[in-house]
Amino acid sequence: MTSVEKSDSGECGTPFVVVNIDDVGMCHGANKAYLELRRLGAVDSGSVMVPCPWFPEIAEAGALKPDLNVGIHLTLTSEKRHYRWRPLTKATPASGLIDSDGFMWRSVAELRRNAHPDAVEAEMRAQIETFLAAGLIPSHVDGHMGGVFAPEFVDRYVALSLEFKLPTLFPATIEAYGPKHNLGAVDQDSYASAAERLLNAGEKLATKALETPWHRNQPALERYQDLYHQIEPGLNFLCLHANAAGEIEAIEPDSAQIRIDEYELLKDPSFLDWADSLSLRRGSLRDARATSR
C-alpha cells in the first residue's frame, strides 16, 4: 500500500482508499480511538459530529495538529436510546428537525417525514461554520447515517459543499453507498442530478463507500479482510466506526463490541502488515481531490 504522496488518485487500476473513522466527537472513546489510530497511520481521516458533547475535545486536538485530517460528519439524527443531542440552530418544533423531547430524530425516515429542507440547510451550515470557527481544517464533508443523501436534502448538501469548497463524499450511484439502508426510498433522478453538479465542479465521486460490518458472525480479522476484498478500482471510502471501550457499552449496548473489535483490529500490527501488503493507494478525500486535478 502506498500513500497518496507517492502516486496520484486518477483513474487507473490501483484503487485509492480513504480509511475513515465516522462518529468522531460523539464520545470520549470515539476521540481516543481516532487519535491513536491516526497516530499509528492506520487511518486517513475522521468524520466529526459537531453537535455532540465531545466535539470540543477533538476540536482542541485538531486545532493544535492541522494534519489530524478531520472532516465534518453532518449530523441530522440522534439515534441512541439515552445518549442524545440537539441541533445547533436551537430549532423549534416548526422546523421539523426535533422530536417531542427536543432532540434530533432517531431515524432518517423520521427526519424525512418531518424536517423542512430550509431548516436542514440552516443546521448543516451551522455545523460547518462551528467546525471552521474552532480552527479546524476540513479534510472532507460527509453525512451521519446518510441523511444528507435523502432526496429532500441532497441538493442542499451539494450546494453547501460547493459554497465552502469542501472535498465531498458522494458515491457515483446510491447503490454504491454502504449505509443506504438507513435512507428508505431514494429518487434516483435527484441523486444523479446532484452527482452531476459535483462532477461539473471538478469533484471526484466515490466508486464505493463501504461500511463497518455490523455483525460478529466471523472473527474480526475475517470480517475486515472480507470488507477490504470489496474494494474496487477508483475512489473507495471506508465508513468505519472504531471506538475505545469505556462509555460506548452504555451508549450503544447492542453494537458496542463491534466498534471495540474494530478499534482493536485496526491497531493490531499483524492486520496493519496485511493491509499494507495490498495493492492500494491511501489518503484523505482532500488528498484525492488535490492529486486528481
UniProtKB/Swiss-Prot annotation:
CDD domains: YdjC_TTHB029_like (cd10802). Mg(2+) binds at residues 73, 144. One of its GO terms (molecular function) is deacetylase activity. Its EC number is 3.5.1.-. One of its GO terms (biological process) is carbohydrate metabolic process. InterPro entries: Glyco_hydro/deAcase_b/a-brl (IPR011330), YdjC-like (IPR006879). The keyword Ribosomal protein does not apply. Keywords: Carbohydrate metabolism, Hydrolase, Magnesium, Metal-binding. Its cofactor is Mg(2+). Belongs to the YdjC deacetylase family. Probably catalyzes the deacetylation of acetylated carbohydrates an important step in the degradation of oligosaccharides. This is Carbohydrate deacetylase.
